[in-house]
Curated annotation (Swiss-Prot):
Belongs to the universal ribosomal protein uS12 family. Residues 106-126 are annotated as: Disordered. GO terms for cellular component: small ribosomal subunit. The gene is rpsL. The lineage of its organism: Bacteria, Pseudomonadati, Pseudomonadota, Betaproteobacteria, Candidatus Tremblaya. This is Small ribosomal subunit protein uS12. It comes from the Bacteria.
Length: 126
């Protein structure tokens, strides 16, 4: 524990919060190109085949991002928009692909939470 004299001379060191999405470098989203689209399995209590993509961002950094929703049309060389946001049961996945932007199509037949999945208003409910 510092003495009062030491605190007068140097003060307390300020705690600096680390970014949870450092590859975006302060931007809300970044465009990128898919270099690999694959499935992976989640951590221990859960079981599934989660769809993820390795994306080279426009700032030349490579990140692993999650493809949300049921079904997708992404493949290698697809242009995608990447936002922050981790997937709790996939270690190393700290980003999400924005559905309905660039080459990533929206989720078909989606009725609820449509804005999160880039789905248009269904014709029948108009």
């Amino acid at each position: 524990m510092p003495t009062l004299n030491q605190l007068v001379r140097q003060g307390r060191r300020r705690f600096e919060a680390r970014s949870k999405s450092p590859a975006l470098r302060g931007c809300p989203q970044l465009r990128g190109v898919c270099t690999k689209v694959y499935t992976t399995t989640p951590k221990k209590p859960n079981s599934a085949l989660r769809k993820v993509a390795k994306v080279r961002l426009s700032n030349r950094l490579e990140v692993i991002s999650y493809i949300g929703g049921e079904g997708h049309n992404l493949q290698e060389h697809s242009m995608v928009l990447v936002r922050g946001g981790r997937v709790k049961d996939l270690p190393g996945v700290r980003y999400h692909i924005v559905r309905g932007a660039l080459d990533a199509g929206g989720v078909r037949e989606r009725r609820r939470s449509r804005s999160k999945y880039g789905a248009k208003m269904p014709r029948s409910a108009a």
